[in-house]
């Protein structure tokens, strides 16, 4: 796994933010924002039912209990699996206010149908279509790196690490059964933060 140094990483995050919030297609934009804010796997997100999101006066969360089954299936036959990619993937995570706003916007955008994220035809998103969309629009946003929908999940982990969120809490949030991936990202980012601190204390 290749890691970027902090200035490069910050620049990439800025580019991804532009891509996420300024994508011309509203439905893709909302999906990318959701992936960035939740750290969910793409297959988990596009499999969400509207009733998987729970909002009360004091709390908002989403239950992640499946992934989209799409291989060797027509769009009409795509459906949600009974479990996630791993046992640790079966989880419930808190939603920030921005994600709640996206949820409410999606309900207005997709008043019919089971799935939270839908195309203009009312069908579920296809993972291949999402990645194709990213590749076709990255040049417009001046992003010169290879892109897939997984980049939003990695960016979510990196940002939480920079903010000082404990490793175990990040692992629990993103549903990593094998913590190696999360730990590698976390250790790399926190190392960069420590190096920045060394530079800062020299300015005291």
Located regions from the model:
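DNA/chromatin major-groove-contacting recognition/catalytic segments
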Residues: 18, 74-77, 163, 184-204
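Gram-positive cell-envelope targeting signals
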Residues: 46-47, 124-127, 188
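Short functional hotspots where side chains directly engage DNA or cofactors
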Residues: 61-64, 148, 159, 168-189, ...
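Short, basic (Lys/Arg/His-rich) helix/loop patches that form interaction surfaces
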Residues: 18-28, 38, 93, 109-115, ...
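Residue-level detector of conserved, well-ordered beta-strand and adjacent loop positions
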Residues: 2-8, 65, 96, 118-119, ...
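Conserved tyrosine-mediated DNA breakage-rejoining catalytic core shared by Y-recombinases
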Residues: 48-105
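Basic, Lys/Arg- and aromatic-enriched nucleic-acid-binding interface segment
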Residues: 1-48, 58, 88-90
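Structural detector for helix-capping/boundary residues
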Residues: 14, 48-51, 155, 184
